[in-house]
């Protein structure tokens, strides 16, 4: 089941990302509207009419001219296309950041897995990343107090029994983080935990 758009918007607001948050979008995300403002969004790999499949987060830092793509499984571009039929190159091309004078931007993409293979918590991990971006826009992927709470593993080991305890611990840290920082999460904790559990996809 995973996270609904309503849940993600409420949690992101609680986390203080409101001034920069453009919203939740399906795969037709129009990109960033201003090349001069900090901005972020949560984007689904599928069309809204499907009910959604997998959440990712995009963020734009105009000072460093860096676009961040946080995808909790750390899939390669090829794997994203293979598994979700999702490509982000056209998204970046049609974004306002591509119209900056020198059109030279840096793309920084997550490459490690922080989410378990059967977990449905992708949207919640995106919220966690956006909290890091809102507070440490120069280093949102790591080396900050929020993302330091979780540990990435090589994507090639995503399904390995060896790393499942680490990935499960990441999800427990995620829930604890949201318990501390989001009143909405606290009020709906049981429901959200059930819909995003570590073994949710295996049990479907």
Curated annotation (Swiss-Prot):
Domain of life: Viruses
Entry-linked InterPro entries: Papain-like_cys_pep_sf, Peptidase_C5
Alphabetical list of SUPFAM superfamilies matching this protein: Cysteine proteinases (SSF54001)
Chief location bin: virion
Alphabetical list of Pfam families matching this protein: Peptidase_C5
Ranges that cross the membrane: none
Compartment annotation: Virion; Host nucleus
Reactions listed under catalytic activity: Cleaves proteins of the adenovirus and its host cell at two consensus sites: -Yaa-Xaa-Gly-Gly-|-Xaa- and -Yaa-Xaa-Gly-Xaa-|-Gly- (in which Yaa is Met, Ile or Leu, and Xaa is any amino acid)
Gene Ontology CC: host cell nucleus; virion component
Effect of residue 137 to L: Loss of activity; gives rise to unprocessed capsids defective in endosomal escape
Keywords: Autocatalytic cleavage, Disulfide bond, DNA-binding, Host nucleus, Hydrolase, Late protein, Protease, Thiol protease, Virion
Active site: 54, 71, 122
Protein family according to the UniProt entry: Belongs to the peptidase C5 family.
Role of this protein: Cleaves viral precursor proteins (pTP, pIIIa, pVI, pVII, pVIII, and pX) inside newly assembled particles giving rise to mature virions. Protease complexed to its cofactor slides along the viral DNA to specifically locate and cleave the viral precursors. Mature virions have a weakened organization compared to the unmature virions, thereby facilitating subsequent uncoating. Without maturation, the particle lacks infectivity and is unable to uncoat. Late in adenovirus infection, in the cytoplasm, may participate in the cytoskeleton destruction. Cleaves host cell cytoskeletal keratins K7 and K18.
Additional remark text: All late proteins expressed from the major late promoter are produced by alternative splicing and alternative polyadenylation of the same gene giving rise to non-overlapping ORFs. A leader sequence is present in the N-terminus of all these mRNAs and is recognized by the viral shutoff protein to provide expression although conventional translation via ribosome scanning from the cap has been shut off in the host cell.
Protein name: Protease
Species: Human adenovirus C serotype 2 (HAdV-2)
